[in-house]
């Protein structure tokens, strides 16, 4: 399935599910996510904000060393639908240069638009840079800090072969004031500890995006 040209579900491998994390890297959350995944030999994809990757390059490198994929999530996380063409290109290309400097040329192959806000202009830039646009098919809205059991149920009730699950290991720069109010992704980490083995028990392999 795709929406405006971006992948929302992967159909090639029916035994896999793809957990993705937006808005990192974050110094307290991203390493904790990696530790949970490592404990279960699970892999994921991290859509990282360029300015945070520049600030915490060692975390991005560790994600890469652990076998995870890293995707482009712009440099500052603006809503690109509201921006002129030059700003759209700057946000995507600047993040790409930053991430390639950390991870190596050719490693970052996917792009996700902030807020899932796509346009033909955005897709044109993404295609020009050579990235694959990616959306999601399961969104438990963990950024709203729901109850842990609700977060778990939303993921497990909607997970299907090829599902792309959206979670967050950070927050956009302009939403930092809400970080502590919303629990600093504590609910996401708690849910992840349950969801990862539960999905594996159903026979799914948790893989990075192809």
Swiss-Prot record:
Broad class of where this protein is predominantly found: cytoplasm
Cellular component GO terms, alphabetical: cytoplasm; membrane
Keyword line: Cytoplasm, Hydrolase, Metal-binding, Nodulation
Active site: 22 (proton acceptor), 168 (proton donor)
Domain of life from the UniProt record: Bacteria
UniProt record similarity statement: Belongs to the polysaccharide deacetylase family.
Name used for this protein in its record: Chitooligosaccharide deacetylase
Organism listed in the record: Azorhizobium caulinodans (strain ATCC 43989 / DSM 5975 / JCM 20966 / LMG 6465 / NBRC 14845 / NCIMB 13405 / ORS 571)
Lineage, top ranks: Bacteria, Pseudomonadati, Pseudomonadota, Alphaproteobacteria, Hyphomicrobiales
